[in-house]
A protein has these predicted regions:
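Alpha-helical transmembrane segments and their immediate juxtamembrane cytosolic regions
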Residues: 1-347
Length: 347
């Protein structure tokens, strides 16, 4: 964040959307173990994965301001800190043999599971000067041009099997670019929705109708809901995953994110959670992996679906309560800003 804007007022709707996003992240990951055994759980999981990271990436773009000092002393530091925590967890708890996966250095530098997002943000933030130039100097035309270029890069990148876990860096980049480029228009949409009920209600109804219909279709499907490439978008194009699939994924993610700005921008109960996403995002995955490794997920596999749903909710909510607590967040806020101190705004 630029130093002069470090004291800028928060936009509540962004915290609200981040709160929704982190809920979906945690519930999505905690139900993944059961998604292939139940159409209800599988359809819910796929629905979450259509848009939850698009929403998160857009929110990151909405609050992004370029600062090389912050990029190094906070964002790079957070990534390395998170990777160190994950590395210790993998070595001590999972007793992983790093020699079989590229060695200890590769395990530390390359993102483990959910850490891809912090990894991607480092690359995305380097493009901020170009994105903000297009937005601020060329206005709406520049924003449209920037989004078109980011989509073109994402679609082209799918033709290459990228090393160093770069596939998602390219695949999800348009969502981040959209948040940066269309920040004025998205802010305007939030203000309009707060003044005119129709701007809030109509997108909500359209989202419910569209997602409800697609959910119903998945519930009627006779086979197994297991198209992993289309769900995760973490591989190059190949059999069962094409450029058209990625284009649809990008379109659905952007349109859904816009609709959620209008529909849920005033749902303030989610805002407190949205202000505490760091600890939840970093630590929920090792907690989940630990529970799976201990066998906590096995007893429910043969149970009726309502029991499985209740079990997932219990575990996910317990994780959220712990990681959303004041002591945990106080520690993580201190760690996040250990090297980065915002400069005071000069008059």
């Amino acid at each position: 964040m630029a130093d002069r804007q470090s004291a800028a007022p928060r936009r509540d709707y962004i915290d609200i959307l981040k709160g929704l996003g982190i809920l979906l992240v945690v519930f999505g990951h905690f139900m993944e173990q059961y998604r292939l055994g139940s159409h209800l759980i599988g359809a819910t999981f796929i629905t979450i994965y259509w848009f939850h990271m698009a929403l998160f990436c857009m929110c990151s773009g909405l609050v992004a301001h370029f600062s090389l000092r912050k990029l190094i002393t906070q964002q790079l530091w957070l990534y390395l800190l998170g990777q160190a925590i994950m590395l210790a967890f993998r070595a001590v708890v999972l007793q992983e043999d790093f020699a079989t996966s590229g060695g200890l250095l590769a395990a530390f530098l390359l993102p483990w599971r959910h850490m891809w997002y912090l990894y991607a943000l480092l690359f995305w933030h380097l493009t901020l000067p170009v994105l903000t130039f297009l937005r601020d100097k060329l206005r709406l035309g520049g924003a449209v041009l920037g989004l078109a270029l980011s989509v073109a890069i994402s679609l082209w990148a799918g033709t290459i099997d990228w090393p160093f876990t770069l596939v998602r860096v390219f695949a999800f980049y348009p969502f981040y670019a959209f948040g940066v480029l269309f920040r004025p228009q998205i802010d305007l949409l939030d203000r309009a929705a707060s003044r005119f009920w129709a701007v809030r209600v109509v997108p909500a109804l359209l989202l419910l109708a569209g997602y409800g219909f697609r959910f119903w279709q998945m519930m009627q499907y006779e086979g197994q809901l297991s198209e992993s490439a289309k769900i995760f978008n973490d591989v190059a194009y190949g059999e069962g995953y094409t450029m058209a699939d990625r284009a649809v994924f990008l379109l659905v993610g952007i349109v859904t994110s816009i609709g959620l700005v209008a529909a849920l921008g005033n749902c303030r109960m989610l805002a407190p959670l949205g202000k505490r996403t760091l600890a939840i995002y970093l630590l929920h995955m090792p907690i989940l992996t630990f529970l799976v490794d201990l066998g906590f997920y096995e007893p429910a596999r043969q149970m009726p679906v309502p029991v499985i749903v209740a079990w997932v909710l219990l575990e996910a909510l317990g994780c959220l309560c712990i990681l959303n607590s004041e002591p945990v967040n106080r520690v993580f806020n201190w760690l996040a800003n250990l090297w980065y101190k915002p400069r005071k705004k000069t008059s």
